[in-house]
Amino acid sequence: MSHVSGCLKAATAVVLAAGLTIGYAAHDDAYIVTPLVSNLAGAAPKMDGVLQNAWGIAFSPAGSPFWINDNATGCATLYDGEGTKVTLQVSIPLPGNVISPGACRSANHNNPSNPAPAAPTGMVWNASAAFLVPGTTIPAAFIFSTEDGTISAWAGGLNPANNAVIAVDNSSTPSAGVGAVYKGLALGVNVKGQFLFATNFRSGRIDVFGPSGGSNGLYMAATTDGGFIDHHIPAGYAPFGIANIDGDLFVTYAQQDKQHHDDVAGTGHGFVDVFDTDGHLLRRFASRGTLNSPWGITRASFDFGRFSGKILIGNFGDGRINVFDDDGTLIDQLEDAYGNPVAIDGLWTLTLGGGRNSSSDTVYFSAGPNNEANGLFGTITPVSHRK
């Protein structure tokens, strides 16, 4: 995915400098960013060349490793909460269940693989026995969306063990060349059962899928009563990120480029809605203001300094993190010890810890700095003395 944006801000450039943190010891209303893993030497304590444009993050509540989608290398790589890599890595398939020869390898821009790897985005851990890996009787453990218009599933016990399997292929829907572009993925439950919700940035819709109903094992398109409609979202904006927060679906909207494939960043370019899991609009949560291609959403823990328990919404456009009350009132943006906005270039996921060797009070993030050419996995924590 290429991204329309301006030059890197000075604050964001620090993320991939040789130092290991952004911010300094600060008062409890200040925050520090600590890189854990990057594909660039010197940008974090640990290096992994496959971690390029790190996007979706998921893990099991039982304390599995953090699974991270590597959008530029068609891979899901695994790390503990201190950034130590786990041996397993999973290749995400292209349409037709094709695995690129470049999948799970450091991208070589001078000699790109043919075909290019898949482009995974959102990811969920699946607790349901209903969503199986297609062609098997094995419940999916992790499910992945892609900009290629596919959704795929993986579980232990597959053969080959390191490949996910296509469960939805809308790469040519409605037609070849203008197929779905899935930017985000969430799971939710309503009275009809458990469903997957994928943000289709190209069509401007939320695509909904239930478990397989046929012999091919592919997940079935489903409808909701509400349809995820907000007539007051301006033309040219489309669903971008999505997250299940306390049982409701928070959906971010970003401005589409001419191809309806990528976002157009800019201050005020963004909206956030809250829907129930049957697609009814509950409320407009946030509009324009400091939003700038918002994507990542989480609720902070109750041990997160000044902003404990608040809703955090990260901007992909400028890397800043907006803090909201539950009613959608903007409180502030996260700042470092010097009062500068925390800014993480190419910010994607924000999530509380809970994976292996992590604290559930710590916010973890993924990012694709330098126009999504690189990758970063790290933490955000409150600190105790402002400069």
Which residues make up each language-model segment?
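Bacterial N-terminal signal peptides that target proteins for export
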Residues: 1-12
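Bacterial N-terminal signal peptides
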Residues: 11-19
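Sequence/structural signature of beta-propeller domains
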Residues: 23-387
